[in-house]
Amino acid sequence: MEDLQLVLFVLGAIAIIAVLVHGFWSIRKQQPKPIKERTRAQNISEAQRRDSQGFDADGIGAVRVRKPGTEDLPSSRNHTSVPVMTLQKASATDAGVASSHGYSPERTTAERAEPVRAERAATNATVAGSMNTQPVTPQPASYGVQGVTAEVKQSVEPQTITPSQHVHIESPKYGATTQASPQPASPVQSQAPREPEPLGEPQDVLVLHVVAHEGQEIQGAELLPCLLSLNFKFGDMNIFHRHSDNAGNGKVLFSLANMMKPGVFDPDNMEQFCTQGIVMFMTLPCHGEAQHNFSIMLNSAEQLADDLGAIVLDEQRKVWTEHNKQDYLRRIKAIV
């Protein structure tokens, strides 16, 4: 019995150790490798895939990076080699010419510079001649562009028509069936403006007075601006009228006269004008709504009294009260 327990204990320990080892191995396998190890592994695998000459199975060699400027262009090498060889020949020629003519090397710098410049000019001419001997392909592109430009200008250029040329445009011919016979236009009945119905004989007159306080007068220079601000207009009988239109057009609603005889105004001499008061009157029946017209007249009288420092009186020259207003409204309703 004790042996069996020992065997089971050993087997359990081995199983636990195996599980732990397998767990650590799985965790380590799942962890990403460091960058250095991966790069090293890639380099080793890449080297194993290539042969001794550096080519893989597809015959592709390793990538080589070439630094810029390590190799000159062929054209530059050709152009630089020609002047060097020519200059060497030119220097040898200069030395031969100097020895043949007996020139001493102790010449001044200015005297020696002139033949060198001449020889260099000759050398440049020789190089230019050698370069010009190479065949040069003509560039017809510029000529082609000019030709196309000329053609475009010719096509765009407008054609002027002289007076001697006549352009004949044929009018479309229509059959007899397409010609519609003109139908006489139906006469339009012009609606004449309706004339307002005559008001008839006046049946009543509503009167309001605006009178200055005792011992005072209303000055014309102050009265005229107030009348104009209230839309009064100077008109017939040399008095002011309030029209249905604020601009001074339309039917007369009520009028305003001087309370003193002869009851008229002179707009040209309003600065020298003065009076004890003015009177407003409205005849019944009147144009429009009588109650509305009376309301405008009453408001105008009260506004003038406030502006001129005066008082409003009724037709009997008594102080205006609410009782007088109700009496005037009753008279309006009796006629309308």
Curated annotation (Swiss-Prot):
Topological type in the membrane = Single-pass type I membrane protein
Topology, Cytoplasmic side: 28-336
TM ranges are: 7-27
Q: Which residues lie on this side of the membrane: Periplasmic?
A: 1-6
Q: Which family is this protein grouped under?
A: Belongs to the ZipA family.
What does this gene product do?
Essential cell division protein that stabilizes the FtsZ protofilaments by cross-linking them and that serves as a cytoplasmic membrane anchor for the Z ring. Also required for the recruitment to the septal ring of downstream cell division proteins.
Q: How does it assemble?
A: Interacts with FtsZ via their C-terminal domains.
Query: What is the protein name given in its UniProt record?
Result: Cell division protein ZipA
